[in-house]
């Protein structure tokens, strides 16, 4: 009872003071006069006390006129204290059970790792991968030397540097590895490398930026389809304070469906790879296109030089412009344009014969045949075979500027060729009618020079029309979008309908003339192919010169194979060439050989 008072009370045995038994001492200055009754005064030094026998303790009050502290009040105090403790304990229990607080507490002992967002792949016409060819896995690395030793040999230089820096970090992290994690006793999550070490269909597909979105080519044009919502799957790891996985726990995968779709192209992977090998061994700058003659579907599209998708910044500084997709750029055309005039003449019922003296003078300007060599009496077939400039200048004069422009437009010149939304072959350039009112400009246009520009894809469409019995079809590369889980098409992409440009009979006549060009004319480097072939060479002046004064030229060959019932239309361009080891016709022949080998 007295322990509840706010002043010191001493319960002692007073034997030396002559007071036997147990007594209570209270200093006189700590309580009021009412407490003095029944007590004995006692002085020790400067302190005065009142002494009370323990059985007869008085009712004590504190302060002025304070009431006594009864036993009931003491019980009430104890009860209040117990109630307070009970309230605190209940509150702690409720906090521990509340989901939000429980989640916060759990979060302090879990680490969430975000896996790379899933991006749809590109597939070829037979459903074979064009991207994601190199298997890779994401594995969760926990602190410690053991993971460092196990994984160091399974990752590239960047991954090795990450491992070295993170050996002592107190948190798990993701690492890309090239070997199957199951062999190391680890769980891996597939994350194939987007592009192969040896590029495949590089310029057509394009590349990604640092955020994983398309920055060029089809990657950019189809970014919304390939990336979907962009949601990421993630791994939740319950970890200790040292960052290691808690005993009995495993990383928990939280799947996220981004809705990303794959895209199937018309490209044939074996044909593309084979044509890329031909280009790499025969040209330093240019492109090769291969079209399926019956449909105008693009089976291969190659542009050189290539760039390194892992070191894009280095390629930006290169003088040979490796980022250009030369199949879609426009160039000076040259003699591969002459079949347009031949087709217009056949449709007009014209097959004139002219005398070639090796040069033609128009408004005081001299236009020469190659080397200035006279060809004598030439008809349309011989003019194509010998690539006689003088003949086509006179034919252009006979047909007239309007007919030439109409024929060029019918074959797709001067118009962009869309391959996907935001991706198209350049429109190139046709001379304006008022420009062709000048006889010199009409002469230039008649054999593919002057202001005429065209993309290799447009030239491919021209020769494909001739090979396909006179029906023009715009080249295309998109076939369908795919559900990558089932491999089934989600949407079959629309293909352009054909339209007749010249009669089937005239197309057959023109094909026969182009076969003669290969067998006896300027394209004999392509002669001797199994099944024969037809085509046309072209050398276009660019007006650009080397420091030594040699003009750079665009060297073309466009044709079809085999000669009867053509299966493929092929265009070869070597741009800005000075000296080349292989002619366009020779490169064409190599492409035909690999097509035959591919079946």
Question: Can you say where each PLM-predicted feature lies in the sequence?
Answer:
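N-terminal amphipathic/hydrophobic targeting modules at extreme N-termini
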Residues: 17, 38-41, 45-48
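Beta-lactam-recognizing serine transpeptidase/beta-lactamase-like catalytic domain environment
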Residues: 131, 250, 292-335, 343-576, ...
